[in-house]
Amino acid sequence: SXAAVVEPPETSQNRIAKGE
């Protein structure tokens, strides 16, 4: 994830799961 990157909802879920 990056600040300039627009992520789909599933990517947000994966980021949370990774603890990032």
UniProtKB/Swiss-Prot annotation:
Residues 10-20 have a biased composition (Polar residues). One of its GO terms (cellular component) is endoplasmic reticulum membrane. Keywords: Endoplasmic reticulum, Membrane, Microsome. It is found in: Microsome membrane; Endoplasmic reticulum membrane. It comes from the Eukaryota. Its main location: membrane. Residues 1-20 are annotated as: Disordered. Dimer of 18 kDa and 60 kDa subunit. On the 2D-gel its MW is: 60 kDa. May have spermidine-binding activity. This is Putative 60 kDa spermidine-binding protein. It comes from Zea mays.
